[in-house]
A protein has these predicted regions:
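Conserved alpha-helical scaffold segments that buttress catalytic/binding sites
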Residues: 2-316
Length: 316
């Protein structure tokens, strides 16, 4: 990672582990394994995809919102800093992210990448592929997103990462095992639905992911994770309703309620198969009262604390 971890700030209630918050816990136990944050401040893919820029400020906004969250006395959390992102050099930035992810996996940590646009996902995947953790194992990619992000384009964008991952899986002779929760029908063309079907992608529409469907959503996740050996979770904040997440590159017209998304995060965070997560598309320029940053922080916190309740190394 090219830049060291920024200074964290937040509320302080007193000394001692019973008063721990993220800002005081970060990098407190450098030798211990735990959850390790990596910032990827890029909106290059969003701009290439015709979206509204601003997601490069996402990592800082998530850290700021996370700083005062209370944390369990025994939880181990690290901040590995930000990957360098320069100009329009997306591919070089993704390569840098891959190196950072592979390094954290090699150290026995659970990397959690803070985006950045959803072009983050391909860099995350490359790091997992380089780590050796996929050797002889079946990878499952679970995406919480209003979009399939399976576009075919001349160059990488925020709309192409899972098409690129499909190619990467084919290259290593593996099946592309990909599921999306929260697909918005009006936001995906018939061609994208056809591509998803051809690639064997499982999905749930946003219409079928409302509060009353939470048990069905949980069952969908359980069925998906049962079929894989290693799990990678990617969250695009545009999966949430625009009222709960206005500060994203492409706000949702319906969305999956935060309560349902949190249930998925708890379930996946508790799964020993989870080895990598990222959260993307926070665009602070369009946020209202830090609403989106705070819900993003809550999702990161939920997964990190769920993972802390088990051994991060279990199941590797």
């Amino acid at each position: 990672v090219s830049t060291s971890a920024p200074e964290w700030t937040g509320r302080t209630d007193g000394p001692g582990p019973e008063h721990r918050r993220w800002h005081s816990a970060i990098n407190e136990s450098p030798g211990a394994t735990g959850v390790s944050l990596i910032g990827f401040p890029s909106d290059i893919g969003v701009r290439r995809n015709g979206g509204r820029p601003g997601a490069q400020a996402g990592p800082g906004a998530i850290r700021a919102a996370l700083g005062s969250f209370a944390i369990q006395p025994e939880s181990v959390v690290h901040d590995a800093g930000d990957v360098a992102v320069s100009g329009d050099a997306l591919e070089a930035a993704q390569d840098g992210l891959a190196e950072a992810v592979a390094a954290q996996l090699g150290a026995g940590n659970l990397p959690f990448v803070l985006g950045g646009g959803h072009e983050t996902a391909y860099g995350s995947y490359l790091g997992l592929a380089r780590s050796g953790l996929l050797d002889g194992r079946r990878l499952g990619v679970l995406n919480l997103d209003a979009h399939f992000d399976l576009r075919q384009a001349d160059r990488a964008t925020s709309g192409t990462p899972f098409r690129q991952i499909a190619a990467g899986e084919a290259e290593r002779g593996a099946d592309f095992t990909y599921a999306v929760i929260g697909i918005s029908q009006p936001s995906n063309t018939a061609a994208l639905f056809t591509t998803a079907a051809e690639l064997g992608v499982r999905h749930l529409l946003d219409l079928d992911c409302q509060e009353r469907h939470v048990e069905d959503v949980v069952e969908f996740v359980r069925a998906f994770t049962a079929d894989v050996d290693v799990l990678y979770l990617s969250i695009d904040l545009d999966v949430l309703p625009a009222a709960q997440a206005p500060g994203v590159s492409a706000p949702s017209t319906l969305g999956v309620p935060a309560g349902v998304v949190i249930e998925v995060c708890r379930l996946v965070g508790n799964d020993p198969k989870l080895v990598l997560a990222d959260i993307t598309e926070l665009n602070p320029t369009y946020d209202i009262d830090n609403r989106t940053a705070r819900v993003a922080a809550r999702l990161v916190h939920t997964i990190a604390m769920s993972a802390a309740d088990r051994s991060v190394l279990e199941g590797r």
